[in-house]
């Protein structure tokens, strides 16, 4: 399956990434090869092969959930340069608030 340069540009734009024309071309080529390899896996005969969900022979071990006193908020905010109403103010990273 061929991944077009336009598709790479579209996904890059959604991810707020910018690539040169050469990088876009290389990504399109690399991604096309990756998708082709994955499509090859669909051709593998798995008839009679037991389903494997994990190779680890472990079980989830959960600890008892016990509430513990937290930290003092005033102490936590001592080194925060800008805050308001116990929220940390950080610089904007998306132009115009973003569209994501």
UniProtKB/Swiss-Prot annotation:
Q: Name one Pfam family in it.
A: GatC
In terms of SUPFAM superfamilies, this protein maps to: Glu-tRNAGln amidotransferase C subunit
The highest taxon in the source lineage is Bacteria
The molecular function terms in GO held by this entry are: asparaginyl-tRNA synthase (glutamine-hydrolyzing) activity; ATP binding; glutaminyl-tRNA synthase (glutamine-hydrolyzing) activity
Quaternary state and interactors? Heterotrimer of A, B and C subunits.
Q: Which family does it belong to?
A: Belongs to the GatC family.
Query: What is the name of the protein in this document?
Result: Aspartyl/glutamyl-tRNA(Asn/Gln) amidotransferase subunit C
Which species is listed as the source? Streptococcus agalactiae serotype III (strain NEM316)
The gene behind this protein is gatC
